[in-house]
Amino acid sequence: MTEKKYIVALDQGTTSSRAVVMDHDANIVSVSQREFEQIYPKPGWVEHDPMEIWASQSSTLVEVLAKADISSDQIAAIGITNQRETAIVWERETGKPIYNAIVWQCRRTADICEQLKRDGLEDYIRDNTGLVVDPYFSGTKVKWILDHVEGSRERAKRGELLFGTVDTWLIWKMTQGRVHVTDYTNASRTMLFNIHDLDWDDKMLDVLDIPRAMLPQVRKSSEVYGQTNIGGKGGTRIPIAGIAGDQQAALFGQLCVKEGMAKNTYGTGCFMLMNTGEKAVKSENGLLITIACGPSGEVNYALEGAVFMAGASIQWLRDEMKLISDAFDSEYFATKVKDTNGVYVVPAFTGLGAPYWDPYARGAIFGLTRGVNSNHIIRATLESIAYQTRDVLEAMQADSGIRLHALRVDGGAVANNFLMQFQSDILGTRVERPEVREVTALGAAYLAGLAVGYWQNLDELQEKAVIEREFRPGIETTERNYRYSGWKKAVKRAMAWEEHDK
């Protein structure tokens, strides 16, 4: 029998699909990536073609094995991680989508959400699903599809249509329609799932008029769901054995599996998650309660805060303001000045996320004086990412009663040493940057590997979690608090800007 040397992680993201092969030491052996089209039918609407998601993801799987000259019988298992909340509805019989995937960023269901608020459902939704009423989550997207595609609700009631988030869609396709499942982490992002009963919530299904017959079975994040023979020479069937939504996969990939451990992912936005163990901590501070993975993929809970503009604000400096020609230049220019000269940039281009949740806030620059130059604005924009992270962390510590001792970080912007040092300074806590930056794929690989015995337990994985660099606070508490109070003042003035116009 051929030795099972490798694990494959499929990382289906918002703009691209990736496949990553890892060996037993969690080293990356091979990577393949394909971008796909973003569809914008109207302002604020975002769609993907589900068939293109599938084509891009399946081709990266074939490609990544061919590239490394690996046959499918050398693969122990496949793990899947995915963009969360994005909703797909397809025909059970043909596997054909009845509409494009409605992407997590899409705001078309704002009216449905406003109606839910008018109907007094906010508290019920928060208490039972852990989420706020927002177009972000899948439930209102599914309702929209059933409302707008003729005859679809009746077909769904007859069991002819299926719903899934991206993980469910991929597994359905990989198993030729034999397996219709999701995991607890993805289910917890739909606004249809009761995170305490660990089952679909009948009241939410009733309110949104979504037939239970179309919903997938919900399973643990680490177990064998089915097998696929796609991707390899020799047609060996490979177990699909791990699923987690991208942020929960990153939390697991950073091995934040104990209560009080937290990670922040610095991508287009920031996503901070803190594991709260077996208890769902109620948030009084505008955070989401979501399901995360415990040490063997079982249900744990987490607090989650999303910042909308992190890397996106650096792109703004590059693309719209033309202050830098490359995102990497931001560190160089930020360190050419000793501080921001009193400037604060609030990058509320699309409103503010956690803990403010103000869709009417708008971007602003405060504290401008004659001596301010472009380097001060670049530095202040970078600092805004760290301030927003502190906003979320303060809310987490208040809700959980846990004082964070170290923050694990990942994502594109963590390569910026200035930002990471300032993050440590403004939090007053250690910031740990791992050697392997592909933590989302790593999380999916770990979940799959643990399910099939490729790795025995987490102790075996702890040795592989090497911290490449640790940043420690370098400023005094008084200085830290003074700077942060300036940020709070700036945010307050940027809030509710749009409402004044109306």
Curated annotation (Swiss-Prot):
GO molecular function, one term: metal ion binding
UniProt: glycerol binding residues: R84, E85, Y136, D246, Q247
Any one GO cellular component localisation term in the record: cytosol
Signal peptide bounds: none
Pathway involvement of the protein, from the record: Polyol metabolism; glycerol degradation via glycerol kinase pathway; sn-glycerol 3-phosphate from glycerol: step 1/1
EC identifiers of the protein: 2.7.1.30
Keyword Protein biosynthesis set for record: no
Binding-site positions, ATP: T14, T15, S16, T268, G311, Q315, G412
Residues where ADP binds: T14, R18, T268, G311, G412, N416
Alphabetized UniProt keyword annotations: Allosteric enzyme, ATP-binding, Glycerol metabolism, Kinase, Metal-binding, Nucleotide-binding, Transferase, Zinc
Annotated InterPro entries: ATPase_NBD, Carb_kinase_FGGY, Carb_kinase_FGGY_CS, FGGY_C, FGGY_N, Glycerol_kin
GO biological process: glycerol catabolic process; glycerol metabolic process; glycerol-3-phosphate metabolic process
Domain of life from the UniProt record: Bacteria
Assigned protein family: Belongs to the FGGY kinase family.
Quaternary structure note: Homotetramer and homodimer (in equilibrium). Heterodimer with EIIA-Glc. Binds 1 zinc ion per glycerol kinase EIIA-Glc dimer. The zinc ion is important for dimerization.
Function: Key enzyme in the regulation of glycerol uptake and metabolism. Catalyzes the phosphorylation of glycerol to yield sn-glycerol 3-phosphate.
Protein's name according to its UniProt entry: Glycerol kinase
UniProt source species: Salmonella typhimurium (strain LT2 / SGSC1412 / ATCC 700720)
Lineage: Bacteria, Pseudomonadati, Pseudomonadota, Gammaproteobacteria, Enterobacterales
Gene for this chain: glpK
